[in-house]
């Protein structure tokens, strides 16, 4: 999982990527390609 300051580029990496908010943090999850997971600081 990458830790990024901005998730704008991360959400465009793959068509299946979506932004989720969990426990006050923003995550990018990708079901079909899990290597694109990311979290915002």
From Swiss-Prot:
InterPro entries: Ribosomal_bL36 (IPR000473), Ribosomal_bL36_sp (IPR035977), Ribosomal_L36_bact (IPR047621)
Keyword Ribosomal protein: yes
Cellular compartments per GO CC: ribonucleoprotein complex; ribosome
Pfam families: Ribosomal_L36
Transmembrane segments: none
Keywords: Ribonucleoprotein, Ribosomal protein
Residue stretches in coiled coil: none
GO biological process: translation
GO-annotated molecular function: structural constituent of ribosome
Record family assignment: Belongs to the bacterial ribosomal protein bL36 family.
Protein name: Large ribosomal subunit protein bL36
Organism of origin: Edwardsiella ictaluri (strain 93-146)
């Amino acid at each position: 999982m990458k830790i990024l300051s901005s998730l704008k580029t991360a959400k465009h990496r793959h068509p299946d990527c979506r932004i989720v908010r969990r426990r006050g943090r923003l995550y990018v999850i990708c079901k079909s390609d899990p290597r694109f997971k990311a979290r915002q600081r």
